[in-house]
Amino acid sequence: MSNKSDVIVVGGGISGMAAAKLLHDCGLSVVVLEARDRVGGRTYTIRNKNVKYVDLGGSYVGPTQNRILRLAKELGLETYKVNEVERLIHFVKGKSYAFRGPFPPVWNPITYLDNNNLWRTMDEMGQEIPSDAPWKAPLAEEWDYMTMKELLDKICWTKSTKQIATLFVNLCVTAETHEVSALWFLWYVKQCGGTTRIISTTNGGQERKFIGGSGQVSERIKDILGDRVKLERPVIHIDQTGENVIVKTLNHEIYEAKYVISAIPPALGMKIHYSPPLPMLRNQLISRVPLGSVIKCMVYYKEPFWRKKDFCGTMVIEGEEAPIAYTLDDTKPDGTYAAIMGFILAHKARKLVRLTKEERLRKLCELYAKVLNSQEALQPVHYEEKNWCEEQYSGGCYTTYFPPGILTQYGRVLRQPVGKIFFAGTETASHWSGYMEGAVEAGERAAREILHAIGKIPEDEIWQPEPESLDVPARPITSTFLERHLPSVPGLLKLFGLTTILSATALGFLAHKRGLFVHF
């Protein structure tokens, strides 16, 4: 078979496979070059007798993620709802508090005002940021030069609000608040639909999973493309100096095409040599954007014992000593293979990597026993984990984050073509970037950029809106009148201060009128 094709796709994750499928469906010849011995990229479904199947990488889908839902349905996949029937748990200062809804409730009135102001402020700031061009926000540079830690120090007045906000950042982007740009993080949350949508299970980003695992999306596209998908072919050189693009792999194979789609995380572009060299901004961008740190952990039990205690399996866990910050029930929809999924996030992933797998499991079980107040948590029947930080062809998970100052300086070139190279990957999406949904959007957009380049579609068809999924409809995210209008803590203090001044002035005036002042 000839190594010549119309398009070479570098990277066989969901983004690259979605791009390849669209081009293949349009009659173009495509070759996918994947470095690993499997497709799927940052999605990874393993199968064995202890788990049946389990997603060790990207897994969750939900309402408003219409592209991945449409593609998966076309490939014959179905979703099921992540269990949230029973109560959730918020574990803080050594105690467990049951709750329902997306956010743990707050009983202290000052903390309540502070929490309410935090979520409201982040959403309001997000509204100022264009999803497709965050560097065009009115205060882009001011916000980009600030870390999320600095922003939270400005917004939050109470320690408990700052702690839950820090957990929120850690969970959303697997990085520390001092590591990420405020502009980038606020954009990230905004393009996922806001603070409530991104964090929620029901009606949110974690509502559903695929029966059989998310790895099937890439695997089924591979079945369609057949031997056009080449595994264990790390790309080491892309040469655009001739009429066609020449792509060389680590095992000394040479492929030739009219166009290339790079569907790998931006930082992995550092593993490839380019002729001619990349333009300055692209060349520097790829050395400045790391990926987050996370170990995904699945603890299996004989049965979902937490449900008997009226807990759904979702735990929001605060505290430096806790290895896991967030869990979800990962039991199969028929109740078999009972499991709790937990994330070891950011600096904790870097700290706990020093332990053995068995030591990490013990720490997790001891934590779950404490939070759930159950000795059954100490009796796991199986354990799976995946440390994405050690994956040389990912560099981390879930996604690339932008440190302060990078987005405004380099963001414009994120998906800007370089000659005949077009860029996909979830990082280049404008909606649910960082998720499987963003991967599909980016892959299909890059494919349509090539269709436009060869004259098959007009430019205004490169970006296409996606109809809402009929199977997974989205309910609007609403807020109450009080949530919208309650003052912040400093607002309340100002109000008290003003009230005090007005009261004192009024009393003084009355006293003066009635001659109550003592005259010296």
Swiss-Prot record:
Enzyme Commission number: 1.4.3.21, 1.4.3.4
GO cellular component assignments: mitochondrial inner membrane; mitochondrial outer membrane; mitochondrion
Annotated positions of the N-acetylserine modification: 2
Entry cofactors: FAD
Job of this protein: Catalyzes the oxidative deamination of primary and some secondary amines such as neurotransmitters, and exogenous amines including the tertiary amine, neurotoxin 1-methyl-4-phenyl-1,2,3,6-tetrahydropyridine (MPTP), with concomitant reduction of oxygen to hydrogen peroxide and participates in the metabolism of neuroactive and vasoactive amines in the central nervous system and peripheral tissues. Preferentially degrades benzylamine and phenylethylamine.
Quaternary assembly: Monomer, homo- or heterodimer (containing two subunits of similar size). Each subunit contains a covalently bound flavin. Enzymatically active as monomer.
Descriptive protein name: Amine oxidase [flavin-containing] B
Gene: Maob
